[in-house]
Amino acid sequence: MNPVPEAAAIRVRRSGPLEGTVRVSGAKNSALKLMAAALLAPGRSVLHNVPRIADVTWMGELLERMGCKVAHEGGTATIDVPDDVVPEAPYELVERMRASIVVLGPLLGRLGEARVSVPGGDDFGHRPIDMHLKGLEELGAEFTTSHGYIEARADNLTGARVLLEFPSVGATENLLMASVLAKGTTVIDNAAREPEIADLATFLNRMGAVVSGAGTSTISIDGVERLAPVEHTVVADRIEAATYLAAVGIAGGEITIEGARADHMDMLLAKLGEMGMRVSPTADGLWAMSPGRLGPVDVSTLPYPGVATDYQPFVVAMLSVADGVGIVTENIFGGRFRTIDELLRMGADIRAEGHHVVIRGVEALSGAPVRAPDIRAGAALVVAGLAAEGETLVGDAHHVARGYEDLVGRLASLGADIDHA
């Protein structure tokens, strides 16, 4: 696959009001898992609406290392899976992104073996993969760890009832992909309910799997003997849509976000409404208007359908210039308040207390050199720069390229004063 060009920094100046129309890409958090799921069936699977981002390129490289042929052009990814897949995910590829752990499920399901490096990617504190391994053990898999690798074997995966101690998205995905070729019925209780889980289940069912209940807390999978490659369109990226909502919320204006799904963002849209934004669905997306300086709100991150932890950096950025005091509570990843130190450099008034932050909005931020610590925090700093006097230079912009296809160009099309440094 061709690499995605990366910029060292993104330069932002105070902007607004924003206006115009922007289209969201397919969801990163779905596309990566669908690419992994293609391993379940030899032959050619075709995915449409695949974003041109670094993480997709890296997943393609990982699949190529396993023997697949991967092409990505014009938003369509073609994955040719051989009969003989190499069941290993090496460190130099896996350490780039945590999502690569989801090759474990399909490799076990189809081949009965896997050797996967302990994953890397964004560091949000303690994010153990124990739930993945415990769940797969319930199906009959056995694991050892050696020299930084998880070595897995499963002579005969057998359906079982698996109760997740937390509705982990990754664990749910790995269990789904492992169990579709297992003997008997698997039931996942306390399963993750995200739209990306439902998208994966739709893809698997098109391949010939028998999955029901995806999008609810109980998913049932009846194992089948074999699957076939298919064609599928990736669901829209709700986190990218939230990024544009935060941008217009901070800068003011009126925009249309094509492709966005209001029904995938209910809780966030309710909170934005409390802040004073107006958001309503259109025939093919969302219309959003921000009348000016927004009011404060209290937000707690929760598993879907609650406010997603991926939205949290954008909410913090918006509250940093709101008219009043807001409180954000992070219940998913305790180490995810990494935007705060950079926003403080921009003049924000934020106080952290454990897994809570208290944000007293200021009238305007001050442009400053800052660093993107991860994908969403980096994008949130770009959005914050729209409300900062002077110039904001967001360094380590390669993180942003991991999750966004042309964020700079799309914000510029709405009237933002932004470019690559």
Feature map (PLM): residue ranges:
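Short, structured segments at the rim of ligand-binding sites
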Residues: M1-A421
